[in-house]
Amino acid sequence: MSSYAPATPSPTPPVGHLDLVPTPTGDIPTIVDAARAAYDHGVTRSYDARIARLRALRAVLVDGEAELLEALRADLRKPDIEGWATDIAVTIGEIDFMMKHLRRWMRPERVRLPLASMPGRARVVREPLGVALVIAPWNYPVQLMIGPMAAAIAAGNAVVGKPSELAPTVATTLGTLIARHLPGDEVGIVQG
């Protein structure tokens, strides 16, 4: 068994390594505008839409598990068990938790008022804000991309994600899997 020291990278890229094709700069406003239009039309806000997108995001991880593990191995030299435990399983657990609690999170919550405001009533109504940008780092490129995307989707927002260019195989794989499972106008990906 050979070892690898990250401080002294190998002179050749690992097998399966992909060169990242960056999104042309001129295409970025189109991706953001599509996400903004999806949000403005209200397609991201209903409970059913949020659950459907969370299920699709979960399917990215479940259906693409082998591809993601291979990409993590190629870019970061993560053993499969580490990639599964730290990037995939944890994120599936996060999404499952969000799906379990989403209906309750969406309900307005009554809150107490100070005596000076009586006989008034108050409640907290959680509303989405629009388009969320998720920029993922290289060290946990799946977990720190999909987890925040899931949170933004659960909140009812459209999302634009940018995987780390320092993990190009993972970035390309995530882009392909997300495009396969989620509507591009609600969840856009920018590479580079």
Protein language model regions, located:
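N-terminal Rossmann-like NAD(P)+-binding subdomain of aldehyde/semialdehyde dehydrogenases
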Residues: S2-R123
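Rossmann-like NAD(P) dinucleotide-binding subdomain of oxidoreductase/dehydrogenase enzymes
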Residues: R112-G192
